[in-house]
Design a protein with these regions (language model features):
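Eukaryote-biased recognition of C-terminal alpha-helical segments
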Residues: 176-233
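Generic detector of well-ordered alpha-helical segments enriched in charged/polar residues
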Residues: 65-79, 116-120, 124, 181-184, ...
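Chromatin/DNA-recognition segments of nuclear transcriptional regulators
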Residues: 146-162, 166-197
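Amphipathic alpha-helical interface segments within eukaryotic helical scaffold
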Residues: 72-149, 153, 157-165
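Helix N-terminus capping/helix-initiation residues
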Residues: 55, 110-111, 198
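The feature captures two recurrent sequence modes
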Residues: 1-105
Length: 233
């Protein structure tokens, strides 16, 4: 993922609880000129395909860590615009709201920066845990790796959804909307390739995903016969 460049900065369990969407708002990121913005012409279908000699768990863990770092960097670029005053709740397109659940299952409505701090700490804790994401050669991966990865990716999706919903104009002003599109496309093609997220978890950005993947080479023409379609009926 060397195509991404950015700078950034930046509490533990979560079950997201999106609220029903409200009437449609203007979505600048769906405009043709915005959809065409990207920083790479890479074929993400081929890029995410599991190489024959690579272990699936290793592929999953490596990408999860990389996606976390890149989403964290991207959010860091616009974090000064994401404040408790500007973003009193963690929302996505359609004003879908994400609620945080603590260890006891109690849900909380947080400001967006609080929510991002919580999920950043949670994901960082998971990927830094040798029992969850082992880094030593020969150390086996736990059976729970895929489930942990799914949860982490769901949380990372919330950050991307919030950026498109609440900070897309900031991204345009800073000239990073092409980076955001490329990161989101890579992230989603990987998730769908390995069935890491459910449709209901990502439907708030399905229109954007379909528009973005139209810019990619036809996956049916790839050499990799097992590559999946991203656009779903």
């Amino acid at each position: 993922m060397d195509w991404f460049m950015g700078k950034g900065r930046r509490k533990d369990n979560s079950k997201d609880s999106p609220t029903p969407p409200v009437p449609e708002e203007a979505r600048q990121y769906l405009e043709d000129s915005c959809v065409r913005e990207r920083v790479t012409d890479a074929d993400f279908y081929k890029l995410v395909a599991l190489p024959p000699s690579v272990d699936y768990n290793e592929w999953l863990a490596t990408h999860s860590i990389s996606f976390f770092n890149h989403v964290n960097l991207m959010y860091g670029v616009i974090s000064e615009y994401c404040t408790s005053e500007s973003c009193p709740s963690m929302t996505g397109p359609g004003n879908v709201q994400f609620l945080w659940y603590d260890d006891k299952g109690k849900k909380y409505k947080n400001t967006a920066p609080q929510y991002v701090d919580y999920l950043t700490t949670y994901v960082q804790k998971q990927i830094s845990d040798e029992s969850s994401y082992p880094t030593k050669f020969g150390q086996p991966f736990p059976n729970s790796l895929e489930a942990t990865t799914k949860k982490c990716h769901r949380l990372l999706f919330h950050v991307l959804a919030h950026m498109y919903h609440a900070h897309y104009s900031d991204c345009v002003t800073l000239g990073i909307h092409g980076h955001l599109n490329s990161l989101f496309t890579h992230f989603m093609v990987f998730n769908i390739k390995f069935d890491l997220m459910e449709d209901k978890e990502t439907e708030i950005l399905q229109d954007l995903l379909e528009a973005l993947v139209k810019q990619l080479p036809d996956p049916n023409q790839n050499d990799d016969k097992e590559t999946s379609e991203v656009t779903r009926s």
